[in-house]
A protein has these predicted regions:
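Proline-centered loop/turn at the N-terminus of a beta-strand
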Residues: 114, 254-256
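C-terminal regions of RecA-like/P-loop NTPase motor modules
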Residues: 143-144, 151, 156, 178-182, ...
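The Walker A/P-loop phosphate-binding site
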Residues: 40-150, 175-178
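Conserved nucleotide-binding/hydrolysis micro-motifs of P-loop NTPases
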Residues: 4-6, 121-125, 133-134, 193-196, ...
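TOPRIM fold recognition
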Residues: 1-51
Length: 348
C-alpha cells in the first residue's frame, strides 16, 4: 500500500512525498519482477528447455521396466507388458473380465510387484476365494494331481461343505491357500460400494508408496460404479471425469492403472469395437490401451451366443482396440474356465 499510514495516496503525496515516491517505485519494481518470473516460467515450457529432463527420464526408466501380465501372448502384443498408462478392459457380462483382471493382478503379484485392487462390486473374501479356486483347479490338472480337488468359489467359501469333503479334498484346498499365501502379501484389496472415487484411490496409492516404499500397479473393478465426482452430474460426465483422473494418477505415479469397464448397450452377437466405449468419450480418447473381450466366433454366420455362454470351457478373444504405442487389431485367443476362475492361452 503506497499510502502507508495515510488515508489515501493524495495525503501521502502531500505529507511525505519522498517516501510515497519510493513506495510507488518499489511497487513498480515488484510488478516487473513478477512479470519477469511469469515470462521465465513460460519460456521454460519450450521443448528445448525440457531436453535435460527428457534425458534424465530415459535414464530413470532403466529402474522402472515394464511389468509383465503373466500372459505371454498379451505381453507380446503390449511390447513386453504394462507400462505407465491407463489400460481399460471392457466386455458385456459373463465374459470374465473381472476374473481376467484379477488373474493378471495375481500374476503380477507372484512376480513380486505390489498391486492395489479396488473392488467396488465384489467382497474382498470373494476375490480371494476366486484366486484360491483357480489354484485348486491348476493343481488338480497337473500330472498326478487330485482331480476331485478342483473347487469353485462357493466350494471354497461354504463352510458347510467341508463336513462332506474328504481329508484329501481339505488338504488340497489348504495347499491352494498356501500357494496363494506365497504372494498374497503383495495384494492389497480395498472394497467399497459407491464410496470410492478417484481421490480416494489417489490417496491410497500415495499412502502405499509412503508406508511401503513401493509403487503399486492399480486395478479398479469397475469404472462405472466409482463414487461420482459430482452427484448432480450425468453418469457420462462422472465416468469421463473418473477416466481423466485415473489417467492423471498413472502419469503422476508413473505406474500402470487397469480399469474394468462394462458395456451397457453392446450385443453378444456383435463383434466388439470402439463403438462399445462411445458412452464415455474419455475412455476412447484418454486410455492408452483399450481391450475388448468377446466370444470367439462373434459376428460369424451360425454363431450362437447362448450356446457359447453355456459351455464350461469358453473360447474368448481379447481384441486390442487401441494401443497408443503398439499394434492394434490383434485378436488373442484364450480358454476361460468360469467355474474355476481361470484364463489360459491355448499354447500354454
Amino acid at each position: 500500500n503506497p499510502a502507508g499510514q495515510f488515508k489515501d495516496p493524495n495525503e501521502a503525496l502531500q505529507r511525505d512525498r519522498e517516501n510515497f515516491r519510493a513506495a510507488v517505485e518499489a511497487g513498480e519494481r515488484l510488478g516487473e519482477e513478477e512479470e519477469q518470473a511469469k515470462r521465465d516460467a513460460y519460456l521454460k515450457t519450450s521443448a528445448g528447455n525440457r531436453l535435460i529432463d527428457f534425458i534424465d527420464g530415459i535414464t530413470a526408466s532403466v529402474n522402472t521396466p515394464c511389468i509383465p501380465t503373466g500372459f505371454d501372448e498379451l505381453d507380446a502384443a503390449l511390447d513386453g507388458g504394462l507400462y505407465e498408462g491407463l489400460y481399460i478392459f471392457g466386455a458385456v457380462s459373463s465374459l470374465g473380465k473381472t476374473t481376467l483382471v484379477t488373474q493378471i493382478a495375481d500374476q503380477i503379484a507372484q512376480a513380486g510387484t505390489d498391486v492395489l485392487v479396488f473392488s467396488l462390486e465384489m467382497a474382498r473374501y470373494e476375490i480371494m476365494a476366486k484366486s484360491i479356486s483357480r489354484h485348486t483347479f491348476q493343481a488338480a490338472r497337473r500330472p498326478g494331481g487330485y482331480k476331485k480337488g478342483a473347487k469353485t468359489t462357493r466350494g471354497i467359501t461354504a463352510g458347510k461343505r467341508y463336513t462332506e469333503y474328504s481329508q484329501e479334498e481339505k488338504d488340497h484346498i489348504m495347499a491352494a491357500i498356501d500357494e496363494y499365501g506365497q504372494y498374497a502379501g503383495h495384494i492389497y484389496i480395498t472394497e467399497g460400494i459407491g464410496d470410492i472415487g478417484a481421490e480416494e484411490i489417489r490417496q491410497t496409492v500415495r499412502d502405499h508408496i509412503l508406508f511401503t516404499g513401493n509403487t503399486p500397479v492399480v486395478v479398479i473393478d469397475y469404472l462405472q460404479i466409482m463414487a461420482p465426482a459430482e452427484p448432480r452430474a450425468t453418469d457420462k460426465q462422472n465416468t469421463d471425469k473418473a477416466v481423466l483422473e485415473l489417467k492423471r494418477l498413472s502419469r503422476d505415479s508413473k505406474t500402470p492403472v487397469i480399469a474394468v469397464s462394462s458395456f451397457n448397450r453392446a450385443s453378444y452377437d456383435a463383434p466388439v469395437t470402439m463403438a462399445a466405449f462411445k458412452e464415455s468419450g474419455a475412455i476412447e480418447y484418454s486410455s492408452d490401451v483399450l481391450i475388448g473381450l468377446q466370444f470367439a466366433g462373434t459376428g460369424e454366420d451360425g454363431f450362437d451366443a447362448d450356446e457359447a455362454r453355456r459351455k464350461k470351457e469358453r473360447k474368448i478373444e481379447l481384441v486390442i482396440l487401441k494401443n497408443r504405442n503398439g499394434r492394434t487389431g490383434d485378436k488373442l485367443e484364450y480358454v476361460y474356465h468360469p467355474l474355476f476362475n481361470l484364463f489360459e492361452e491355448p499354447t500354454s
